Regions:
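Ligand-binding loop in jelly-roll beta-barrel domains
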Residues: 81-113
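"Short basic amphipathic alpha-helical interaction patches in structured regions
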Residues: 64-72, 90-93, 120-123
Length: 198
């Protein structure tokens, strides 16, 4: 929806289950937010998240002292380790038109030896994320490598920083008629392909 002066929806919140609004009503949700859509302060431990915002914005604050707004192609990598609290709110900054949010969040369970590692937070700004273009294929490399492209330095104590890990996170856009073959995973690894039409 359009935003108001508090970056919340410029629409009635009547009839919504504020604090737990996961029903798509009028084309949007509040999630756990009561004034601004999103997820107020909450704890995590023992895993890491990779948050990819293709459209819209996320306001992040955490117990490590990090705070800021990211979006429009930026990626946030957070290793919760022994524990971190954070909030992820989705400000509706456009007051004259609808605010679209297109966000993917991937959770990785850390291996036993890293579950109590120090928490870590890293931003991958969209202009720093490697992009490989070839034959109607545009591939953004968040983690791993593909052909001549390699990801930016991964966070420490992350699946992406382990030399024995086959972790790859790629955002692939194909032109009509383009063909891309998913590279074979190393023995003992799995690949997951999520197709999304935006």
């Amino acid at each position: 929806p359009k935003g108001n002066e508090e970056m919340g929806p410029d629409a009635s919140l009547e009839g919504r289950n504020l604090g737990g609004d996961f029903v798509v009503k009028d084309g949007w949700r509040m999630y756990h937010g009561k004034k601004v859509p999103g997820f107020p302060y909450h704890p995590h431990r023992g895993f890491e998240t990779v948050t990819i915002v293709n459209q819209g914005y996320c306001d992040h604050t955490d117990s490590l002292g990090a705070a800021g707004r990211f979006g429009e192609g930026d990626v946030q990598w957070m290793t919760a380790g022994k524990g971190v609290q954070h909030s992820e709110m989705f400000p509706l900054i456009n007051r004259n038109a609808p605010n679209t949010l297109e966000l993917f969040q991937i959770w990785f369970n850390l291996p036993g030896q890293d579950k109590l590692t120090e928490p870590y937070f890293k931003m991958l700004w969209h202009e720093d994320i490697p992009v490989v273009k070839q034959d109607g294929i545009r591939l953004r490399i968040i983690a791993g490598s593909w052909r001549d492209g390699k990801n930016v330095a991964p966070p420490p104590n992350s699946w992406a920083s382990r030399p024995d890990s086959d972790l790859a996170i790629w955002l692939i856009r194909l032109e009509p008629g383009a063909i891309w073959e998913l590279p074979r995973a190393a023995d003992g690894s799995n690949r997951m392909l999520h197709c999304f039409l935006g």
